[in-house]
């Protein structure tokens, strides 16, 4: 394995006083793609939420190390600033906030500085073109009226724009047709090529994996 980016040690996680994860151990190196597989109900998504710091998922013991730092107690926004990204299985609709405004705000939070609007929009248009997304989606309210495939493309677009160190994709290929899976796979490959970031792909299917190079697979 290359230099460790993510290291999870003996992680126990509870949701509403019910323990979901019972001592999980996992390590992901820099510039690696790992797959987390298993049937529904085994805690795959719970692990993703725990890594990103969702407060509904309580770590009762164990640790999460990211880039050599213990982030177990860090709030979700601080983990995002450090370069952890989660693509949701069912992305929420956000009326009143356009896709473009959401991504720009997230980038400014990450960098701590204002972005030049023209430069941002140019990069956004170029990235959308790579994913075969119509430019009009940038000015639509985030995920409002989007099809399942469009929501997943919007998540991949955010990943490419934010360039995290670690991207966690939770069932990104779930419910998609062949063309949408192909586009998502292309986005994942572009992420690896452009950023050399690491990926943790959570899935119970093998469709998206057929087009990707995977360094390691884990079963829950």
What are these regions (language model features)?
Residues 37-39:
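The feature captures the beta-strand-to-loop junction immediately N-terminal to the Walker
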Residues 159-160:
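ABC ATPase C-loop
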Residues 171-172, 179:
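Walker B catalytic motif
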Residues 181-194:
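Helical segment within the ABC ATPase nucleotide-binding domain
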């Amino acid at each position: 394995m290359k230099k460790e980016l993510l290291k999870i040690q003996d992680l126990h996680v509870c949701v509403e006083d019910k323990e979901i994860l019972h001592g999980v151990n996992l390590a992901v190196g820099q510039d690696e793609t790992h797959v987390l597989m298993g049937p529904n109900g085994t805690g795959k998504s719970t692990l993703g939420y725990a890594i990103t710091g969702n407060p509904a998922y309580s770590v009762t013991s164990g640790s999460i190390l990211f880039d050599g730092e213990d982030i177990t107690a860090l709030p979700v926004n601080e983990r995002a600033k450090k370069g952890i990204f989660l693509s949701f299985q069912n992305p929420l609709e956000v009326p009143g906030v356009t896709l473009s405004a959401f991504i720009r705000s997230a980038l400014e939070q990450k960098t701590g500085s204002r972005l030049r609007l023209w430069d941002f929009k140019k990069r956004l248009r170029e990235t959308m073109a790579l994913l075969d997304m119509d430019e009009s989606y940038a000015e639509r309210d985030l995920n409002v009226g989007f099809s399942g495939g469009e929501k997943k493309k919007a998540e991949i677009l955010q990943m490419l724009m934010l360039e995290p160190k670690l991207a966690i994709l939770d069932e990104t290929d779930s419910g998609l047709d062949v063309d949408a899976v192909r586009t998502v796979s292309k986005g994942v490959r572009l992420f690896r090529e452009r950023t050399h970031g690491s990926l943790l792909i959570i899935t119970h299917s093998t469709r998206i994996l057929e087009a990707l190079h995977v360094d390691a697979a884990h079963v829950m």
